[in-house]
Amino acid sequence: LARMINGEGWLGTKKQCKLTIIPCENYTHATRYRLPIAPSPNLPNMQSVYLYPAICLFEGTCVSLGRGTSLPFQQYGHPQMVGYSHSFTPRSVPGAKHPPLENERCWGIDLSQLPEDSVQKAGFDLSYVINAYRNLNRGDAFFTPFFEKLVGVDYVRTMIEEGCSAAEIKAMWHDDVERFKQQRRPYLLYPNS
């Protein structure tokens, strides 16, 4: 990204990031890498890292994403979600002081045992947020203003409220993603596989 920032002149006239790049040998975008150290107490394993892009959207809703439990970013729930046998209770712990819905039993979904390949293939999966939104039936009260900052656009909330599917929402940004992929091509360090 820093090479692209320089190449596209995004910092303004005559400003450049000072870069030193040491490429990895035998690496491609398909290479699996296991983090030797958890990047955060709330991302304790690779499953949480792979689920993060989708589950972090709950930070902009009334739903818990499991902070203050043994499965942060690997489960989600709310005290009023119905139809689920999985439950968890967020507690104040190191790395998650006073998490949302602290000391409240939340009902929801455990994603910790999903096959890693399916999580990676799904990528930025909006179905979890859509599922919770429909289950809680709270309308606009489901979301906080932070949701738009997380998702990056203002139409996702509206489309969820209108009953659109994850595929319909993703179709809205498909062309933008393809344009970005073309724009970034000259700056890639590793082959796209």
Which ranges hold each PLM region?
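Conserved anion/nucleotide-ligand pocket segment
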Residues: 1-55
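Intrinsically disordered, low-complexity boundary segments flanking structured domains
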Residues: 4-11, 59-63, 75, 93-100
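Extracytoplasmic
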Residues: 14-16, 70, 106
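Generic structural "secondary-structure junction" signal
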Residues: 24, 57-60, 65-67, 77-78, ...
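Active-site-lining helix/loop region of Rossmann-like oxidoreductase modules
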Residues: 33-86
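Conserved functional hotspot residues or short segments at active or partner-binding sites
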Residues: 72, 76-174
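C-terminal regions of mature proteins
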Residues: 164-193
